[in-house]
Regions:
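A short, N-terminal "cap"/entry segment at the start of jelly-roll beta-barrel domains
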Residues: 5-106
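Short acidic-glycine-tyrosine-enriched beta hairpin
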Residues: 145-164
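A short hydrophobic beta-strand segment most commonly corresponding to one strand
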Residues: 131-133, 156-158, 171-191
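Short histidine-centered beta-strand/loop micro-motifs
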Residues: 104-105, 121-126, 143, 168
Protein backbone atom coordinates (compact mmCIF):
# COMPACT_ATOMS: atom_id res chain seq x y z
CA UNK A 1 0.00 0.00 0.00
CA UNK A 2 2.91 2.37 0.64
CA UNK A 3 3.54 2.68 -3.11
CA UNK A 4 -0.08 3.67 -3.72
CA UNK A 5 0.09 6.31 -0.96
CA UNK A 6 3.26 7.67 -2.58
CA UNK A 7 1.52 7.72 -5.97
CA UNK A 8 -1.32 9.71 -4.38
CA UNK A 9 1.15 12.16 -2.84
CA UNK A 10 2.90 12.65 -6.19
CA UNK A 11 -0.37 13.19 -8.08
CA UNK A 12 -1.44 15.80 -5.52
CA UNK A 13 1.92 17.57 -5.83
CA UNK A 14 1.35 17.81 -9.56
CA UNK A 15 -2.20 19.16 -9.14
CA UNK A 16 -0.96 21.65 -6.55
CA UNK A 17 1.88 22.99 -8.67
CA UNK A 18 -0.48 23.51 -11.62
CA UNK A 19 -3.05 25.49 -9.60
CA UNK A 20 -2.14 29.08 -8.72
CA UNK A 21 -4.72 29.42 -5.92
CA UNK A 22 -3.44 26.30 -4.17
CA UNK A 23 0.26 27.06 -4.59
CA UNK A 24 -0.28 30.67 -3.43
CA UNK A 25 -2.19 29.47 -0.36
CA UNK A 26 0.66 27.27 0.86
CA UNK A 27 3.55 25.28 -0.50
CA UNK A 28 3.45 21.52 -0.02
CA UNK A 29 6.37 20.33 2.13
CA UNK A 30 9.03 18.32 0.29
CA UNK A 31 10.20 16.48 3.42
CA UNK A 32 7.08 14.41 4.16
CA UNK A 33 7.64 11.18 6.08
CA UNK A 34 5.41 8.20 5.27
CA UNK A 35 3.46 7.12 8.34
CA UNK A 36 1.80 3.72 8.54
CA UNK A 37 -1.51 4.61 10.17
CA UNK A 38 -4.08 2.10 11.42
CA UNK A 39 -6.92 1.84 8.84
CA UNK A 40 -10.43 2.84 9.85
CA UNK A 41 -12.79 1.96 6.99
CA UNK A 42 -16.07 3.67 7.87
CA UNK A 43 -19.42 3.12 6.15
CA UNK A 44 -19.51 6.46 4.26
CA UNK A 45 -16.10 5.73 2.71
CA UNK A 46 -17.51 2.54 1.17
CA UNK A 47 -19.72 4.77 -0.99
CA UNK A 48 -16.61 5.67 -3.00
CA UNK A 49 -16.30 2.10 -4.35
CA UNK A 50 -18.57 2.48 -7.38
CA UNK A 51 -18.20 6.22 -7.93
CA UNK A 52 -16.54 7.16 -11.21
CA UNK A 53 -14.94 10.58 -11.61
CA UNK A 54 -15.83 12.56 -14.74
CA UNK A 55 -13.03 15.10 -14.36
CA UNK A 56 -10.05 14.13 -16.50
CA UNK A 57 -7.71 16.45 -14.57
CA UNK A 58 -8.47 14.87 -11.18
CA UNK A 59 -9.51 11.34 -12.18
CA UNK A 60 -6.17 9.76 -11.20
CA UNK A 61 -6.32 11.22 -7.67
CA UNK A 62 -9.97 10.18 -7.32
CA UNK A 63 -9.17 6.62 -8.45
CA UNK A 64 -6.18 6.24 -6.11
CA UNK A 65 -8.24 7.45 -3.14
CA UNK A 66 -10.92 4.91 -4.11
CA UNK A 67 -8.32 2.10 -4.22
CA UNK A 68 -6.77 3.16 -0.92
CA UNK A 69 -10.08 3.73 0.86
CA UNK A 70 -10.09 0.43 2.86
CA UNK A 71 -6.54 1.20 4.08
CA UNK A 72 -7.15 4.82 5.09
CA UNK A 73 -7.66 6.12 8.62
CA UNK A 74 -11.09 7.67 8.01
CA UNK A 75 -12.47 9.94 10.74
CA UNK A 76 -15.65 11.86 11.56
CA UNK A 77 -14.80 14.38 14.35
CA UNK A 78 -18.43 15.21 15.14
CA UNK A 79 -20.92 13.58 17.48
CA UNK A 80 -24.44 12.62 16.41
CA UNK A 81 -25.99 15.04 18.94
CA UNK A 82 -24.27 17.97 17.17
CA UNK A 83 -24.80 17.10 13.50
CA UNK A 84 -27.35 14.29 13.33
CA UNK A 85 -27.16 10.64 12.33
CA UNK A 86 -28.00 11.32 8.67
CA UNK A 87 -24.97 13.60 8.25
CA UNK A 88 -22.58 11.07 9.81
CA UNK A 89 -23.86 8.32 7.50
CA UNK A 90 -22.77 10.47 4.53
CA UNK A 91 -19.51 12.09 5.72
CA UNK A 92 -15.91 11.14 6.32
CA UNK A 93 -12.44 12.60 6.07
CA UNK A 94 -8.81 11.69 6.60
CA UNK A 95 -5.58 13.56 7.16
CA UNK A 96 -3.21 12.78 4.30
CA UNK A 97 -0.43 15.26 5.26
CA UNK A 98 -0.08 16.64 8.77
CA UNK A 99 0.93 15.96 12.37
CA UNK A 100 -1.03 12.66 12.48
CA UNK A 101 -1.52 11.97 8.77
CA UNK A 102 -0.47 9.23 6.41
CA UNK A 103 2.49 11.53 5.67
CA UNK A 104 3.93 13.43 8.63
CA UNK A 105 4.62 17.17 8.67
CA UNK A 106 4.11 20.06 11.09
CA UNK A 107 4.15 22.67 8.31
CA UNK A 108 0.54 22.25 7.12
CA UNK A 109 -2.34 19.79 7.04
CA UNK A 110 -3.99 18.36 3.95
CA UNK A 111 -7.27 16.52 4.40
CA UNK A 112 -9.49 14.62 2.01
CA UNK A 113 -13.21 15.11 2.71
CA UNK A 114 -16.03 13.01 1.30
CA UNK A 115 -19.69 14.09 1.35
CA UNK A 116 -22.36 11.82 -0.08
CA UNK A 117 -25.21 13.28 -2.15
CA UNK A 118 -28.09 15.07 -0.39
CA UNK A 119 -26.05 16.08 2.64
CA UNK A 120 -25.62 19.27 4.67
CA UNK A 121 -22.31 19.92 6.43
CA UNK A 122 -23.57 22.32 9.05
CA UNK A 123 -22.18 25.76 9.80
CA UNK A 124 -18.83 25.46 11.56
CA UNK A 125 -15.58 27.34 12.02
CA UNK A 126 -12.01 27.00 13.25
CA UNK A 127 -8.99 29.20 13.80
CA UNK A 128 -7.01 27.72 10.91
CA UNK A 129 -7.27 29.37 7.51
CA UNK A 130 -8.21 26.83 4.88
CA UNK A 131 -8.74 26.29 1.21
CA UNK A 132 -11.02 23.69 -0.39
CA UNK A 133 -10.24 22.18 -3.79
CA UNK A 134 -12.94 19.99 -5.35
CA UNK A 135 -11.66 16.78 -6.93
CA UNK A 136 -14.96 15.15 -7.94
CA UNK A 137 -18.65 15.97 -7.89
CA UNK A 138 -19.96 19.29 -6.64
CA UNK A 139 -21.22 21.12 -3.57
CA UNK A 140 -22.72 24.45 -2.60
CA UNK A 141 -20.23 26.38 -0.46
CA UNK A 142 -21.51 29.10 1.84
CA UNK A 143 -19.56 31.35 4.18
CA UNK A 144 -20.40 34.43 6.21
CA UNK A 145 -19.55 37.67 4.37
CA UNK A 146 -19.20 35.90 1.00
CA UNK A 147 -21.59 34.93 -1.78
CA UNK A 148 -22.48 31.25 -2.02
CA UNK A 149 -20.87 29.30 -4.83
CA UNK A 150 -21.32 25.89 -6.45
CA UNK A 151 -17.88 24.33 -6.71
CA UNK A 152 -17.07 21.69 -9.31
CA UNK A 153 -13.73 19.96 -9.99
CA UNK A 154 -10.66 22.24 -9.99
CA UNK A 155 -12.53 25.05 -8.19
CA UNK A 156 -11.32 26.44 -4.85
CA UNK A 157 -12.86 28.22 -1.87
CA UNK A 158 -10.91 30.07 0.83
CA UNK A 159 -12.13 30.43 4.43
CA UNK A 160 -10.59 32.98 6.80
CA UNK A 161 -9.80 32.26 10.43
CA UNK A 162 -13.04 31.72 12.40
CA UNK A 163 -15.20 32.43 9.32
CA UNK A 164 -18.39 30.34 9.63
CA UNK A 165 -18.98 28.17 6.58
CA UNK A 166 -21.12 25.24 5.42
CA UNK A 167 -21.39 22.82 2.49
CA UNK A 168 -24.42 21.26 0.86
CA UNK A 169 -24.46 18.45 -1.68
CA UNK A 170 -27.52 17.90 -3.82
CA UNK A 171 -27.69 15.17 -6.47
CA UNK A 172 -23.92 14.58 -6.53
CA UNK A 173 -21.32 13.40 -4.06
CA UNK A 174 -18.32 15.65 -3.41
CA UNK A 175 -14.68 14.67 -2.84
CA UNK A 176 -12.37 17.55 -1.90
CA UNK A 177 -8.89 18.37 -0.71
CA UNK A 178 -8.80 20.77 2.24
CA UNK A 179 -5.56 22.47 3.29
CA UNK A 180 -4.80 24.24 6.55
CA UNK A 181 -1.67 26.40 6.55
CA UNK A 182 -1.57 27.46 10.20
CA UNK A 183 -3.07 26.67 13.60
CA UNK A 184 -2.99 22.96 12.81
CA UNK A 185 -4.44 22.04 16.21
CA UNK A 186 -7.53 24.23 15.73
CA UNK A 187 -10.74 22.88 17.17
CA UNK A 188 -13.65 22.65 14.74
CA UNK A 189 -16.81 24.07 16.30
CA UNK A 190 -20.40 23.88 15.13
CA UNK A 191 -21.83 27.41 15.06
CA UNK A 192 -25.41 28.62 14.92
CA UNK A 193 -26.33 30.32 11.65
Amino acid sequence: MKKLFIDLKNEIYQLWENNLELSNFTKLPKDLIYNEVQPNYILPAKKLENWQSHSIETMRVHDIIKQLSPYINWKQTYEEKDVGKSFLEKYGYFELFGPTGHFLTNKMSLYVIFLDAENFYTWHNHEAEEIYFVLSGSAKFESKSDEFEILTPLKTRFHKSFQPHSLTTHNEKCLSLVAWRDKLNSEIKVVKN
